[in-house]
Amino acid sequence: MTLYLTSDLHVDHYAENRTEISYFIERYLPSSDVLCVAGDTADNPKIFVDFYRLASQKYRQIFVTFGNHDLTVRHDDYFMQNPFTETDKKLSWIKEKLSELPNVTLLDGTTAKIGKLTIGGCMGFNDFSVGSRTWPHPKEWLLNQWQHWYDNVHWRYMDNNPGAILKDELRKLRNVISQKPDIVMTHFIPTAFGIPRKYEDEYSNAFFYFNADEYLAKMKNKSVWLAGHTHDTGKKVLSAGRNKITLLLNPVGYPMETKGRYSLKDRATAAMIKL
């Protein structure tokens, strides 16, 4: 059995109809038995669902979590093709449509099994613990900056209260980790790794990462944690006691980020698990 691990598909930046979605699948997603997507399938809910309707014909099983772009809704002059003005209603509709696809599993604080593997996940959320390495800012300042950040501007979710959102996502994550999964998927990144040097001094790092030491310490040996959100690749093996845990970032990203910047073949090799 083979599993391909990825994130940040942003399909609606590549495709507007089913024909273009099919091309995207063949162009950017290699063949495997299982596809794992750690968030940011699409802002557009129709394209989100159509993508999985088509991808489910290629893969034996698909596991997916939500990402920050999946939570966006129509407001003012933004996302006018999105019929939803409340994030909860959008997510409920997506869940309902995905439930019609027997080989697509949405992980939202839940786990599922395929063969002997247990896979679990949720979106996760940032905790403002990471920022600029050279010019650190207090949490209060970062919270204020978050008011102008993409998520707060385009979500209508849990009153856009970052403390409440974090608490809810960590509750989901605790449930996932308690099941001792072989693969964990979150969109937000569980520790500050994979930050490109050019971004090390960006305060916006605070909106990508969270401190997951408590959860990493409880993971089983040779497990994998797939994350996304950043559009840069990364791989790191952590030691948690006697256990080794692989952290993996393998996004698709936006069209201008894919052209000539990386080899699809190399990506497939780096993020393909063979059992």
Model regions: which residues?
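N-terminal active-site segment of His-dependent metallophosphoesterases
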Residues: 1-64, 70-76, 274
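Beta-strand-turn-beta hairpins that frame and shape the catalytic cleft
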Residues: 1-4, 111-121, 181, 237-246
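Active-site neighborhood of phospho(di)ester-bond hydrolases with catalytic His/Asp-centered motifs
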Residues: 5-7, 35-40, 63-68, 105-109, ...
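Active-site environment of divalent metal-dependent phosphoester hydrolases
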Residues: 10-16, 42-47, 69-79, 111-114, ...
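A basic- and aromatic-enriched beta-loop-alpha substructure that forms the phosphate/nucleotide-
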Residues: 61-134
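Short, flexible/disordered intra-domain loops and linkers
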Residues: 74-88, 197-204, 260-263
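Binuclear metal-dependent phosphoesterase catalytic core
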Residues: 113, 196, 205, 209-222, ...
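Active-site-proximal loop/helix segment associated with metal-binding centers of metalloenzymes
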Residues: 118-184, 188-202
